[in-house]
Curated annotation (Swiss-Prot):
Short sequence motif named Nuclear export signal, residue ranges: 82-109
LRR repeat intervals: 265-290, 291-314, 315-342, 343-370
Name listed for the protein in its UniProt record: Nuclear RNA export factor 1
Gene field: Nxf1
Domain RRM: residue ranges: 118-197
Basic residues composition-biased segments: 19-28
């Protein structure tokens, strides 16, 4: 932490640690005309665009193999066309095409001395797919189980590694066998590869123990502060010939695991001067050290503020970022502060400089949403009409043969289905059956596809409904709202839950919203002209409430075993409450045929909206 009263350009990089830095390195001392100078950092290195677009194997040399010359992003650097020692101090990228047959793969040696062949799997345009969905779909088509190593996105592609030729051949057979929701075929490209870096750079168990010992020496228990500044140069590590480079995934993972297992209460962490050029491997620190308040990332190679998004779950109060290339990209101090504070709104100090207090809005006060109201029908006549229609409709819909719904639809009827636009894992939740027909306009932008997903005419509509999973709806969960009504048209929606009754998804709970537009039918009923169905996974609360109150068996008359007095009481209670005979009898039986107590129970439950609409269907 900077000493009190120290000027902005004289602060040091201490986070309760004694090392000091040279003066004049503040992030707001720009030269005139100096902006983002990424294109001028050495001419002999391979451009990032080539690295990102090449399908060949990529090998990174050790970032500290060359002489150690401090990189200063705050001074103007001329373009260089020839290799310099400065450039050799940075990470080198070598792109090579492996011309060996795919079956041979790239050889790597595991810690137990066995040799493994590695293959890099590439999915062009894979970035548009959710990771879990993509891997689940590949696994469902692959003839052997596989363990994807180091899954990541690169430009528009998705990549991961597998470690033997048998798995690679099985994945090759999946090429173009997976169809996405837009009916596109997914390509899978297999290339032999060097072992992924997470495997190459794994520390051996004895090395992890030595790292743990060294980290304990660097930990200040009184301040709950861990100093990992320039860890690779630690004398004890160098003496034991242990190479710990925190910009390698395996090394960072080992360090974070030690923190999680030994000092999860950590408040301050110094990672300065470790040549970190990305923070992907550090993202788990949000869970492993949730109390972290002070983080020093100064003197690294972070080029973009977007890297901070990977750790923005931390509730940081102090952050050091000076001497990173990203500091060159800000035009002024206020932009720099506001950009960083977007990620860490509770930040009080940046690069040792006190910040103005954050503007806070009192939004954390608990607010309760008003309780959901019951159905709305407008009039009793409309209520009777709609409830009778829904009772008939879903009796046929859940019967197993939906062909009987033909009479419910107009000749020119139109129907569509949609699902959530970005589900976490559609395969795991078994929503994949609905995806190919989903017409979610937030996801489907192509007008031709949108039109194709509309089902026109009653024959096509019912044929489409017959292809959907077989269901059993919980009519007690229905909430019905009439939103528009004229003499020739009625628009209403119904919300509720259902479960699937066959296949792999048997007993899976779904929630739905269905909007009908109907016109009068010749039989004094309703005829559907437009049907929109939205299906999602039921929430935990909906699952808990689903099918909790089984519907009584329909009956048109009181149970014969009732006495005459009970039958008279039942008829009177049904007339006064408006409930049908089945639900009236249930209420009376639950209250031991005490008419007064039954009436009180009915009034109480109706006021709370706990009596389902089916109870009033006669």
């Amino acid at each position: 932490m900077a000493d009190e009263g120290k000027s902005y350009n004289e602060h040091d990089d201490r986070v309760s640690f004694p090392q000091r830095r040279k003066k004049g390195r503040g992030p707001f001392r720009w030269k005139c005309g100096v902006g983002n100078r990424r294109s001028g950092r050495g001419g002999s290195g391979i451009r990032s665009s080539r690295f990102e677009e090449d399908d060949g194997d990529v090998a990174m040399n050790d970032p500290q193999d060359g002489p150690r010359v401090r990189f200063n992003p705050y001074t103007t650097r001329p373009n260089r066309r020839r290799d310099t020692w400065h450039d050799r101090d940075r990470i080198h990228v070598t792109v090579r095409r492996d011309r060996a047959p795919q079956e041979r793969g790239g050889a790597g040696t595991s810690q137990d001395g066995t040799t493994k062949n590695w293959f890099k799997i590439t999915i062009p345009y894979g970035k548009k797919y959710d990771k879990m969905w993509l891997l689940s779909m590949i696994q469902s088509k692959c003839s052997v189980p596989f363990n994807p190593i180091e899954f990541h996105y690169e430009n528009t592609r998705a990549h991961f590694f597998v470690e033997n030729a048998t798995t690679a051949s099985a994945l090759k057979a999946v090429n173009y066998k997976i169809q996405d929701r837009e009916n596109g075929r997914i390509s899978i490209i297999i290339n032999s590869s060097a072992p992924p870096y997470i495997v190459q750079n794994e520390l051996k168990p004895e090395q992890v123990e030595q790292l743990k010992l060294i980290m304990s020496k660097r930990y200040d228990g009184s301040q709950q502060a861990l100093d990992l500044k320039g860890l690779r140069s630690d004398p004890d590590l160098v003496a034991q010939n242990i190479d710990v480079v925190l910009n390698r995934r395996g090394c960072m993972a080992a360090a974070l695991r030690i923190i999680e297992e030994n000092i999860p209460e950590l408040l301050s962490l110094n990672l300065s001067n470790n040549r970190l050029y990305k923070l992907d491997d550090m993202s788990s620190i949000v869970q492993k050290a949730p109390n972290l308040k002070i983080l020093n990332l100064s003197g690294n190679e972070l080029k973009s503020e977007w890297e901070l998004d990977k750790i923005k779950g931390l509730k940081l109060e102090e952050l050091w970022l000076d001497r990173n290339p990203m500091c060159d990209t800000f035009l002024d101090q206020s932009t720099y502060i506001s950009t960083i504070r977007e990620r860490f709104p509770k930040l009080l100090r940046l690069d040792g400089h006190e910040l103005p207090p954050p503007i806070a809005f009192d939004v954390e006060a608990p607010t309760m949403l008003p309780p959901c109201k019951g159905s709305y029908f407008g009039t009793e006549n409309l209520k009777s009409l709609v409830l009778h229609f829904l009772q008939q409709y879903y009796a046929i819909y859940d019967s197993g043969d939906r062909q009987g719904l033909l009479d419910a639809y107009h000749d020119g009827a139109c129907c569509s289905l949609s699902t959530p636009s970005n589900p976490q894992n559609p395969v795991r939740h078994n929503l994949a059956k609905y995806f190919n027909d989903s017409r979610n306009v937030k996801k489907i932008k192509d007008t031709t596809t949108r039109f194709r997903l509309l089902k026109h005419t009653r024959l096509n509509v019912v044929a489409f409904l017959n292809e959907l999973p077989k269901t059993h709806h919980d009519v007690n969960s229905f909430v019905v709202d009439i939103s528009a009504q004229t003499s020739t048209l009625l628009c209403f929606s119904v919300n509720g839950v259902f479960k699937e009754v066959d296949g792999k998804s048997r007993d899976s709970l779904r929630a739905f919203t269905r909007t009908f537009i109907a016109v009068p039918a010749s039989n004094s009923g309703l005829c559907i002209v437009n049907d929109e169905l939205f299906v999602r996974n039921a929430s935990p609360e909906e699952i808990q409430r689903a099918f909790a109150m089984p519907a009584p068996t329909p009956s048109s008359s009181p149970v014969p075993t009732l006495s005459q007095e009970q039958q008279d009481m039942l008829q009177a209670f049904s007339t006064q409450s408006g409930m049908n005979l089945e639900w009236s009898q249930k209420c009376l039986q639950d209250n031991n045929w005490d008419y007064t107590r039954s009436a009180q129970a009915f009034t109480h439950l109706k006021a709370k909206g706990e009596i389902p609409e089916v109870a009033f269907m006669k």
